[in-house]
Amino acid sequence: MSKPAVKSVQSATAKTATRAVNIRQKVKAPKQAKPEGKGSTKPVKDRPRVEIKKALHPRNAHLNGYDFPALISAFPRLKTFVRPTPYGALSIDFADPLAVKTLNAALLKHHYGIGAWDIPQGALCPPIPGRVDYVHYVADLLAEGDKSCAISKARVLDIGTGANGIYPILGSQVYGWQFVASDISAHSLTNVQSIIEQNPALQGRISLRLQPDDKAVFKGIVQPEERFELTLCNPPFHASMAEASEGTKRKVNNLQLNRGSSVKAAPKLNFGGQAAELWCQGGERQFLATMIRESQMFADQCLWFTSLVSKQENLKPCYQALAQLKVDTVKTIEMQQGNKITRVLAWSFQSAAKRKLWRAEHLAR
């Protein structure tokens, strides 16, 4: 994607909302599966991948829930939205978009040093604990246990950064990564540019690129001779605006039922999202198919390609597509946040030996 005159930011799609204040995660034992051979050069077969089931990542700052007194101290405006629950804990109304946006602003300020963060009305408001979990797991994926690896030197591409720019913000603040963030929406990128300009800690760390082709993923964004250690993406998973609206209503109704409200209440929600953030032709499955197909064009320019996969049934066609491309290594990381389960699908065209050489050349301490 060509850079717009003004640094642009991409539209990331964040589609989950967390109701529980104290996020309690159960660690599930991993399923017994035949492990993949490290560095195997055999084509990937269509078989279940080893899935790592865990609670929030051990390095996740939100592992023990939200410390509302500390968050209010850092961001006093949050106090307006905090109420005691019937169980004696503090919480907010997670169906109130303004409350959720204010909580995000408080979390970003208290934990990540971001003093100014805002999104346009109707834009996707991401759950911070789940988003930073993705960042932590791909950081481990990149290092592969190599203690000589300085992952802070990594260059990362965020596909569809959205108006919130959450992955570049978290990745740059937690690990010091350099980001290219792309999006098909100039409006979204303009908002991310505004966030960058208001936060000195982000300046010089995030480059924004507008994707001129709404049917492309990497084409038009990755430049010749450019190198990335990681790509990140939270793809739109609905196939139409009508489907996205139905999904939103379902989530709102579930929240209202859980808190004892009438399901006929007006559907105010934190499951916002502009069109490009929520749906695309063919939905998540088609988006992932395009991403996998295009990744082959940049096989030697990127060490690890990764994406969130919201729908379990979309994994099998992804495995089949990767097998056809003779991808060297495929990994699936299952993440759980409350009742929400999502997966990180990761693949590399490089063998284990080549990945080690890549780290030695580009990420050595």
Swiss-Prot record:
InterPro entries xref list: METTL16/RlmF, rRNA_lsu_MeTfrase_F, SAM-dependent_MTases_sf
UniProt record, GO biological process: rRNA base methylation
Highest taxon, organism lineage: Bacteria
Pfam family, one: Methyltransf_10
Stretch list, region Disordered: 1-48
CDD domains: AdoMet_MTases
Family affiliation: Belongs to the methyltransferase superfamily. METTL16/RlmF family.
Protein name per Swiss-Prot or TrEMBL: Ribosomal RNA large subunit methyltransferase F
Organism: Shewanella baltica (strain OS223)
Underlying gene: rlmF
